Amino acid sequence: MKRRHFLAGAAGAAAMAALPATAQTSRGFDFIQVDVFTQNPLEGNPLACFPDAGGLSDAQMQAIARELNHSETTFVLPATAGGDAKVRIFSTTAELPFAGHPTLGTAYVMAKTRPGKNSLVLEEKVGPISVTLEHRPDGMFVEMTQNEPLFGAKADPKMLADALGFGVDEIDSRYAPQMVSTGSNFLIVPLKSVSTLAKLTLGHQLPPEQRAAFPGGIYYVVTGEPQIETRLLGATSEDPATGSAVGCAAAFLVQNSIRKPDERIAIRQGRFVNRPSILYVRAGMANGKATNVRVGGYVVDAMRGRFTI
């Protein structure tokens, strides 16, 4: 992780005293870092959340996200459309309309810093996202309702296998790989076994002529074994737990009768990058179509700090 500016307690006061007068006029912004989809710190997917980001410009938010170097960083602002708060989500390079683990992690931080509510509506660029918070004996469980699933184009299994580096016979032929969105686009690729999942490598991508039809990430889902496990690999990195993608997977599982409507499914992700995660999903069925996708998990504190600008 790149340089961070942490100032806290006596050490922070001493550091401030040593700064030039111009620097002492800068403002500190507190953040809370949490791990999402786990009950254990240093597992799951990390998120830095700024619970009071008023006064930060767009450029500063982007620069902070780049400095912290997480997959996403969130900034909480006053609500503008009737929700509980406006939430802006930044990757290291751009603002995102929606992301799963940042939504859950931000709701957790809000529950810690603004206690008293068991449900929240977060205003994100994709629209309002409803979140519930449940204080359980073993930790805080947070669950969001994602946008209604949209099912897109189906992909040719041989094309996928050739492009992504495994045999076509390793795709679960009972189900067609398909684009699904519950706020973000993902191509769901059903695999027969965890052994295929384990040998996937970074750097594979679809041919250029296929990328327009299948935008977004490729989410590998083991459908041929009782325990569902997943991976999301990019060109240079792997995501340890992907709330937006697992919502699409939930819709896919119910739509294809792999799991029953409203069955809560525990899905594993992240063990191949030493960040084991458990994502809990469920989806309903109405008029022959998957609906009411919910994604949840536990969230835990990791650390707190102050960013000075």
Residue ranges and their predicted role:
Residues 2-98, 104-309:
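Active-site proximal loop and beta-alpha junction motif in alpha/beta enzyme cores
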